[in-house]
Amino acid sequence: MAEDKRSLLQRFIIWREKNIKEKRFILILSFLVGIFTAFAALILKVIIHWIQNFLTDNFNATEANYLYLVYPVVGIFLTGLFVRYVVKDDISHGVTKILYAISRRQGRIKRHNTWSSIIASSITIGFGGSVGAEAPIVLTGSAIGSNLGTIFKMEHRTLMLLVGCGAAGAVAGIFKAPIAGLVFTLEVLMIDLTMSSLLPLLISAVTAATVSYIVTGTDAMFKFHLDQAFELERIPYVIMLGIFCGLVSLYFTRAMNSVEGVFGRLRTPYKKLIMGGAMLSILIFLFPPLYGEGYDTIELLLNGMSNAEWDTVMNNSFFYGHGNLLLIYLILIILFKVFASSATNGGGGCGGLFAPSLYLGCIAGFVFSHFSNEIEMTAYLPEKNFALMGMAGVMSGVMHAPLTGVFLIAELTGGYDLFLPLMIVSVSSYLTIIMFEPHSIYSMRLAKKGELLTHHKDKAILTLMKMENVVEKDFVTVHPEMDLGELVKAISASHRNVFPVTDKEGVLIGIVLLDDIRNIMFRQELYHRFTVGKLMTSAPARLYDTDSMEQVMRTFDDTKAWNLPVVDAENKYLGFVSKSKIFNSYREVLVHFSED
């Protein structure tokens, strides 16, 4: 039966190659990716809401609920069991994994990612994990695109495009935001915008959004009604809000990396579970709005609250009934949200940073405007408007994606009347954070390793190249105790003009250049007088097998060498890299990468 299925697929692939042009088939695949991704997003949302409603239906809104101490630990524990014994692979940092797949795995994402992130994030968020469902569904969508392309034997350049289609469809489907889905793919995943890539991305995003509209209706995700039109006199305050959001984004990014670094140093999953679960439980117990994605709090702030309604933000907390402490309460939430999100993922949970970014931005915008109004600055700042703008500001800063921030918030809320201030806030936030952090929270790990694909063509091509593909191993090795006569025999057996010198353990200790011994190599009376140890010189530099190609090229530029030896972490000789080999490989990647 399996053979029949395989042969049927093979027959279809052969038929497709004869009857359907490549570009047209890519459009068909992008349409399918949009449909599958939209349904994956809908399934994820339904499961999360069902779990949350089941667990919190009988909560008393007027007093602290001690179940907050239990639920997050249970969620992280169940997620950890699922990942460890069912998935048996790391599925955290979804967007970072997509970036890595594009730059180092030729767009190939493991098959289990088409479903594993849905289950893991549903458990984590449903039980109160303080993270978002969007990054897991983006990874799911990208995995759907990658594996669909793999099934039909598409080349890796097309796989990378289908990965982008999956991401665009995921954002469009879960947020009902097709433009934001397209822009996210271009800004965050850094898929190049060409005519051959634009149409598939659009088809996938529009298809996913349409499916969401059909199933859940055409209403925006958040209800927002503009009570006061934007006035130009508020532009200085909008710029200040953008700078404030940039600083909040910087705090969130650096604190997140620091806390996750602490969890990374814990070697056993049980220590991570205990530390993460305890931290998250205590934080949610003290600040219940940290429970789950936080969209209920966003809804409250965007709807606008009277003084009498402020207590609703503090439901189930010890602050309930003290509306005069709202500002302090929200500032504490801004400070502790990053610890709640880090504890969720670091402890073994699965979730993304879309929702935390939106959540922090909404609260930051509200706090900024509410504080300004309290001290009676010259212009009144509509708090719900600034809460909306804050969402765009923090998202733009955390993701280093100002256009995504603008279009996503506009489509999420229908707040198109605030398009100008949304742009101002997003740009101000982005310009603020890049002064301190050149890479987004998703890309900084890959950028440090030289594994990040960017819109910079030269760096992008170097990123797509791999060290193992340019290392040449047909060099004859010699040893320091060999005499000149033995060296001449080695030279006669080689077509190279450089000879690595290694000890008995294979450690590189030097090189012999043919040009350096040319004047004595034919004088037989000197064959027993000189040894390789006396004739060898140090290599201009050493390359390591873990070096990125950008580091390799920088070393060649610094040394002006034509050949450089490659060693491992223990300095054992592996081979040589030559400029000619690099240039040939560079040219091959350039031609393939630039085809349109």
What are these regions (language model features)?
Residues 510-517, 575-582:
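Short hydrophobic beta-strand motif reused across regulatory alpha/beta modules
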Residues 478-495, 501-502, 521-524, 542-569, ...:
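The conserved cystathionine-beta-synthase
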Residues 474-478, 534, 539-542:
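Structural signal for short hydrophobic segments within the conserved structured cores
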Residues 449, 528, 593-596:
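Post-kinase regulatory C-tail/linker adjacent to protein kinase catalytic domains
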Residues 465, 482, 512, 530, ...:
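Short beta-to-alpha loop/turn elements within the nucleotide-binding domains of ABC transporters
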Residues 1-474, 479-499, 503-509, 590:
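Alpha-helical transmembrane segments and immediately membrane-proximal extracytoplasmic
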Residues 508, 562-563, 573:
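Short beta-strands and strand-coil junctions in structured, solvent-facing domains, enriched
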Residues 204, 425, 472, 514, ...:
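ATP/adenylate-binding site constellation spanning eukaryotic-like Ser/Thr protein kinases
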